Amino acid sequence: MKYIVVSDIHLGHIRTPTSHIINSFTKTVFTEKNKDLDVFFIAGDLFDRLLDFNSIDVREILKFLDTLLTFCTKNNIKLRVLEGTPSHDWQQPEVIVKLNELRETRCDLRYHKFLDIEYIADLNKHILYIPDEWSNCHEDIETQIKEKLQEHSISKVDVAILHGAFTYQAPIAKYAGFLYKEDYFLNLVRGYIHIGHYHTHTFFDRIVAQGSLDRMSHGEEESKGYVRVEGSNWAFVENPHAYVYRTINVVASTTINTLDKHINQLPKGSHVRLVLSKDHPLNIAFQDVKLRYLDYHVRKLNKEAISESNEITYIALSEDLEMSDSYVLDKNIHNTLKNLVLSKYQLNQTEQNKFLGYISILENLVEVEEEAI
């Protein structure tokens, strides 16, 4: 079975324009290679917020959804849409169903708002779907899944499409909420388990979090994209058109000319966050800095005044400033830790897979939280 999983598209987003999200999606997903897919999964958060029907965003979204249906219909691709976080989707993906009903040639479409198992007969595959915030009790979810398995007279499913978070993703979670148990789902699902919600792409054994298709804020400046699966192999497909959110660590020697060099090379409309000490001249004159870069969205994040030689806070570099979203002393610390553990301890294959899953989280862990001004 060939399929892709896209999630956390967030149409109607406040900071990343809907027009950009649609253009980015079109260039990255509606490709010649993806015309041979069997299934196109959207794993939640197609929308960012509840939208007014008279908004410009909605007009663009309706046209985009029609294009999505056309792409799937023309190429005989099944489209499966999962409800995401209630405060994002608000069951607005229902509009895709209505648009499809109006078409002369309809797409093979299903919109999953409930925990369910679907059997796709021509592919001979059972797919499990679980929307976000379905239950805060894992035992309850297991009971519901058991009932669905009995309805289909099966003991396992082939693929799972979820929205939420697994325990291994806890280090990147912004709050302590309900977490899925890895062992349970790895025993339940023969193939891959795909999960949306957290925007960072990670994996743990056969659990693959594709992350968001585009960037929505600072703190997620890593590569964005979606996941493509062919048989037993999966690959992360990067979105090279993702919106730019750039964090600049300002050091004592940084001047306005240095900022010019780095900011002016970014696409207009990019979001730029300056991390600087309260006593830095650029912080004191920050309003003038904002006026200088009117084509960009510039904000700041203050930290306590420190010397440039304080390597615990700064990444020591030869350049005037470091473009990064982390303050870790050794930016390759995950490699150091990985080499140390694998050389010192004898791990079996399962233990190695779990450990490497945690390392992949550490690689993307962001230590600086966004601050509005």
Residue ranges of model-derived segments:
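Conserved beta-sheet core of the metallophosphoesterase superfamily
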Residues: 172-234
